[in-house]
Amino acid sequence: MDFLKSLPPLQTTDSNSTTAAVNTTTTTATNTATTTATNTATTTTTTTTTNLNNLINESKKKIHRLTQEVVNKISAGEVIQRPSNALKELLENCLDAKSTTITVTVKDGGMKFLQIQDNGSGIRLEDMGIVCERFTTSKLTKFEDLRSIQSFGFRGEALSSISHVSHLKILTKTADSPCAYRACYLNGKLTPPSPNEQSSDPKPCAGVNGTQITVEDLFFNTPSRKNVLKNTVDEHSRIVLLMKKYAINNPTVSFILKKQGDPTPEVHTSGGQNSLEKDVIGSLYGTDLSKELKIITIDPNNPNPNNDDDDNISGSQIKNSNLNRLDFTMKGFFSSTNYNSKKINFILFINGRLVDSKNLKTGLEQVYSKYLPKGTHPFMFIRLLVPPKNIDVNIHPTKSEVKILHEEQIIEFIQQKVDQELSISSNSKTFSTQILLPGFDQDNVSSSQKKQKNSQSSSTQTKSTNNNNNPTSRKEPIEYAKDKIRSDSKSQTLDAFLNPMDYNNNNDSSIDDNDGSGIGRYDDVDGSAGAAGAGGKFNDNLIFNDNSENEAPRDIDNPLSSVTPIKSKEQRQQQSTTTTTTTTTTTATTKSNSPASKNDIKKLQEHTFITPRKTRKYKQVELTSIKTLISEFQSNVHDGLKEFFNDCVFVGCLDHSYALVQFGKKLYLINLENITKELFYQLSLLRFSDFDSIKFSQSLSIYSLLLVSLDSPLSGWMESDGPKDKIADYLTKLLISKKELLNEYFSIEINEDGELVGIPQVLDHYVPCTDNLPIFLLKLATEVEWEFEKECFAGIVKEISSFFKIEPSFLKLRDTQVNNQQQTNSTTTTNNINFIKKDGKEWIIQHLIFPAFRKLSPPKKFANDGSVIQITTLDNLYKVFERC
């Protein structure tokens, strides 16, 4: 109770002073409340007065009619939303004009230049004055005509809308006109072709029958729309897809699409009366799809239609139809259960119009989900014919939506029919077969070969006997030892058939030395690369430090390793054990908690490595840009080097940059870095959009990896470039914006959080050195020309090849450090460690890289740039050693 003594004494007051204090407090509180209420009332009165004044001002505004220019621009923005919408309107005009050849030329995704030319009926000279005015058409005279409309256009808004958001030029000629006429349009009116000319009348000129419409500087007067459509690659892809859709629906019409200045078309169909939809699908999407197409025809009035009859249904067949309540017919091309793709291809034409139907698309996807693997999609092309009286086409400004009578029942009918056909096809599987030559008996091959060998042996013995008995007979030429070739490129050693994992475990190729001799390019402060991938920070003092004690990456030495977590310095120093190696008494130290141990490696491979396909048939590429890049290296092949790489025999690795090979009687030295870079460049193009994937056990933060790369002298970063964190943040956002393209075509998987999930598997069983992963991402973001398709793909493939090549720099540096340590450490121990690591790398080069050289198309520059150098010949060696 002593603490009570320290408390201050209570102050006592009389009752009068207490009452006075209470009264004073009450008066003060009352005054404060009164003041607050007054202020609140004043504020409320001010707000009410302001709102009342605003209402009075709003009521004074008069309703007025919008000017025609404003109305036209609003309408143009609804009808022409992007270049593909403009092209769709122009394509339909060409088809309405009965054209048989349609050529489209674009630049910058149609934003800068879009031109379409046909050989249709053309535009009369008398009509050129009003052809671009709003609500002018030759296909509709009264509203009731919509009930029987057979043409695509009917509103007369397409050319008018285009002329209000671009510079429009028309060159046209009718069959009965002696010459062609050209005119320029702006805001729906004729305009002089140049400021120097005053007349805007159409000018006569030379031309062929048909119409050529040129659209330049689309959305030049609507900068907000133009800024939204900056991705010209995406716009160009939409145009390509649109052309393919119309080409399939109109197989008798020739469609040609090409970029301005490029003579090679990206889309080209021959057309002709004998051309069928299936042929067009095969030419545009590949024969692998066309072989798996099922033609499904639905006619409620004919329960057993013949799928082979009348492959081209025209819109005129719906006239005078006498069907039941579901008055429609359908013909569709559906992929079977043997085909699937990463992206769905759903194409729907109703009465010849390209439209969207989410209900029908979703319903058919549900049907296919029962037969296709998860994450894959089918190909569906549907042509639906409905009487015009049962369809409302005037629903959407872009005509992309329509309303059909009894839509739900029609969709259900189609679902049942497709499900029935797919259930039948799911019971069969298509396999490729090889046709045997006539008279070829495969079962008797072995016996016939044995008989042939026995007969040859007998004849040889007989010949030998005759030669011995007859001294005058001619002798066989003698083969000297110096001329005998004892190697064969077709023969294989026993270790080639061993599992690569077992091979490395048996040889302990992933053993680390506890003296810190390994040279790594970065360490993880938290003890694992996964921590950095999850947003952890890298140690800036250990990144790209050649003198640090980081572990050397084991990806090159271990052909099946994926991204191995890098231990921190503290973890590596915690514990070590001594392991006795092979035939010598030399010992090498390793850490029991290191990922290089057998159990840890096995665990890592189970979680991070995806075994690729053993055999591969390259997917047929349809993109013109990729075909061009492939043809470039295939047309630049050195025939002599092609034969050299097909038949050369691996001798051994001279160091981490060069390998020795034998070809015939000659010994060559080849540059592994140059040749493997070209190899992975070609393989990446051949495997375009068909890569296997190497998955990381834990996603890696791209932002952190980019910061790591910027700390490297290889990045070329300077202070004038700006802060590293801002650069890394900008480049991360850039790569995230391109993640769909990178994943679709190259299996470089990036998630929404800006983390790297996986990289492509370019060569089966081969994993690149992940030490170079930060620089790879930096180069991918900065060295690729994203705006143009061909340059974009070429740049990405170039960076992939640089990432996957046999890169000797850090391995050479490691050997240099090991050699330096020989002066202070045991020479036998150091040499043994170096031998183990080199042996694992040599296995990869011999059994993974060298077999792939047979797929290489060596360029002609390899003959002169030092990639292949002749060292000596058997004749020269025999002059020195006189023996094999």
Curated annotation (Swiss-Prot):
One of its GO terms (biological process) is mismatch repair. GO terms for cellular component: MutLalpha complex. PROSITE patterns: DNA_MISMATCH_REPAIR_1. It is found in: Nucleus. Residues 446-472, 577-590 have a biased composition (Low complexity). Pfam families: DNA_mis_repair, HATPase_c_3, Mlh1_C. CDD domains: HATPase_MutL-MLH-PMS-like (cd16926). Belongs to the DNA mismatch repair MutL/HexB family. PANTHER family: DNA MISMATCH REPAIR PROTEIN MLH, PMS, MUTL, DNA MISMATCH REPAIR PROTEIN MLH1. Heterodimerizes with pms1 to form MutL alpha, a component of the post-replicative DNA mismatch repair system (MMR). DNA repair is initiated by MutS alpha (msh2-msh6) or MutS beta (msh2-msh3) binding to a dsDNA mismatch, then MutL alpha is recruited to the heteroduplex. Assembly of the MutL-MutS-heteroduplex ternary complex in presence of rfc and pcna is sufficient to activate endonuclease activity of pms1. It introduces single-strand breaks near the mismatch and thus generates new entry points for the exonuclease exo1 to degrade the strand containing the mismatch. This is DNA mismatch repair protein Mlh1. The gene is mlh1.
